[in-house]
Amino acid sequence: MNTISILSTTDLPAAWQIEQRAHAFPWSEKTFFGNQGERYLNLKLTADDRMAAFAITQVVLDEATLFNIAVDPDFQRRGLGRMLLEHLIDELETRGVVTLWLEVRASNAAAIALYESLGFNEATIRRNYYPTAQGHEDAIIMALPISM
């Protein structure tokens, strides 16, 4: 059974392990552990009695920014990222958030397809934003109107 709940400080070491396993260029430890607090809505998804995914989202007034989402490679391709995002969007709507923003690597076709299927639209592009093994790649900034 899959459950979604708040990502607490006691969950951070397990989430940090997922961060390192799921991303080719993970956040620094300082950045990861620093994106917590009262302005954040950070969630975890548990599957098979194990943390399988997390989302780090900052909420400021009526806007939110999804800073980071990761699914453990052992749990990928099961729809858990979609499940976590749908839950996050529902929760943000109840809090009166009108727009959810995110950025995604231009090469991450699977994530872009997921975001588009949930109603996100491309807002702009940040050129040469993300590091790669060969240099840099663009970030696509996307927005989802949630409620008015």
Curated annotation (Swiss-Prot):
<comment type="similarity">
    <text>Belongs to the acetyltransferase family. RimI subfamily.</text>
</comment>
<feature type="active site" description="Proton acceptor">
    <location>
        <position position="103"/>
    </location>
</feature>
<dbReference type="InterPro" id="IPR000182">
    <property type="entry name" value="GNAT_dom"/>
</dbReference>
<comment type="function">
    <text>Acetylates the N-terminal alanine of ribosomal protein bS18.</text>
</comment>
<feature type="binding site">
    <location>
        <begin position="69"/>
        <end position="71"/>
    </location>
    <ligand>
        <name>acetyl-CoA</name>
    </ligand>
</feature>
<feature type="domain" description="N-acetyltransferase">
    <location>
        <begin position="2"/>
        <end position="147"/>
    </location>
</feature>
<keyword id="KW-0963">Cytoplasm</keyword>
<dbReference type="InterPro" id="IPR006464">
    <property type="entry name" value="AcTrfase_RimI/Ard1"/>
</dbReference>
<dbReference type="InterPro" id="IPR050680">
    <property type="entry name" value="YpeA/RimI_acetyltransf"/>
</dbReference>
<dbReference type="Pfam" id="PF00583">
    <property type="entry name" value="Acetyltransf_1"/>
</dbReference>
<dbReference type="GO" id="GO:0008999">
    <property type="term" value="F:protein-N-terminal-alanine acetyltransferase activity"/>
</dbReference>
<dbReference type="GO" id="GO:0005737">
    <property type="term" value="C:cytoplasm"/>
</dbReference>
<feature type="binding site">
    <location>
        <position position="108"/>
    </location>
    <ligand>
        <name>acetyl-CoA</name>
    </ligand>
</feature>
<keyword id="KW-0012">Acyltransferase</keyword>
<feature type="binding site">
    <location>
        <begin position="77"/>
        <end position="82"/>
    </location>
    <ligand>
        <name>acetyl-CoA</name>
    </ligand>
</feature>
<dbReference type="InterPro" id="IPR016181">
    <property type="entry name" value="Acyl_CoA_acyltransferase"/>
</dbReference>
<feature type="active site" description="Proton donor">
    <location>
        <position position="115"/>
    </location>
</feature>
<protein>
    <recommendedName>
        <fullName>[Ribosomal protein bS18]-alanine N-acetyltransferase</fullName>
        <ecNumber>2.3.1.266</ecNumber>
    </recommendedName>
</protein>
<keyword id="KW-0808">Transferase</keyword>
<dbReference type="InterPro" id="IPR043690">
    <property type="entry name" value="RimI"/>
</dbReference>
